[in-house]
Regions:
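Acidic/His-rich, divalent-metal-binding segments that scaffold phosphate/diphosphate chemistry
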Residues: 1-64
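Residue-level signal for pocket-adjacent positions within structured domains
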Residues: 9, 144, 153
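Residue-level signal for secondary-structure boundary elements
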Residues: 22-25, 121, 152
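Divalent metal-dependent catalytic cores for phosphoryl transfer on phosphate-bearing substrates
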Residues: 43-150
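Short helix/strand-capping connector loops at secondary-structure junctions
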Residues: 151-158
Length: 158
């Protein structure tokens, strides 16, 4: 099992560099998605690690968007994170803002989940309920095909 900082320490590190509600909510969403995928894909023993990677994946984005995934290693080391977690976090920027290639299944899940949660979240905010709980998959597929909808979410990455 991989070493991981506590969730409390991860949240403190995240909040040190992120204050915007959107960024904090995105981090919490990706954390939950990563935990779910860890269990779903047979990595339940590593669910906390996967979730922490999801929580911290954009630690540097709010304050240093032009250095995204490049400033992260410094911030994560300062928070007590190990090399496995740092590599995983940086790998979600592969081909976009860094050259750290996702090699582990968890890193590939993060690569896609980051963009996908943005698309799903944008679709949910358009609904009267502001929730995914009553969203039909067909509605999401329709929005996915519209390149103008959530244009910042890379369909190629998804």
């Amino acid at each position: 099992m991989r070493e991981c900082i506590t969730r409390e320490a991860a949240l403190a590190a995240l909040r040190k560099y992120n204050q915007e509600p959107f960024h904090l909510q995105h981090a919490l969403t990706v954390e939950g998605v990563m935990r779910w995928y860890a269990r779903e894909l047979g990595y339940g023993q590593e669910a906390d690690f996967w979730a922490t990677v999801g929580l911290l994946h954009d630690i540097d984005f709010e304050q240093w968007p032009e250095q995204h995934c490049q400033k992260a290693p410094e911030l994560l080391r300062e928070a007590g994170c190990g090399d496995d977690l740092i590599h995983a976090v940086c790998s979600h920027g592969y081909g976009i803002c860094c050259d750290v290639e996702p090699t582990h299944l968890m890193e590939k899940v993060l690569f896609a989940a980051d963009e996908l949660t943005g698309l799903v979240g944008a679709a949910a905010r358009m609904r009267p309920s502001k929730s995914v709980m009553d969203m039909e998959v067909s509605s999401l597929k329709k929005k996915y095909k519209d390149k103008k909808f959530a244009a910042g979410c890379s369909r190629e990455v998804i």
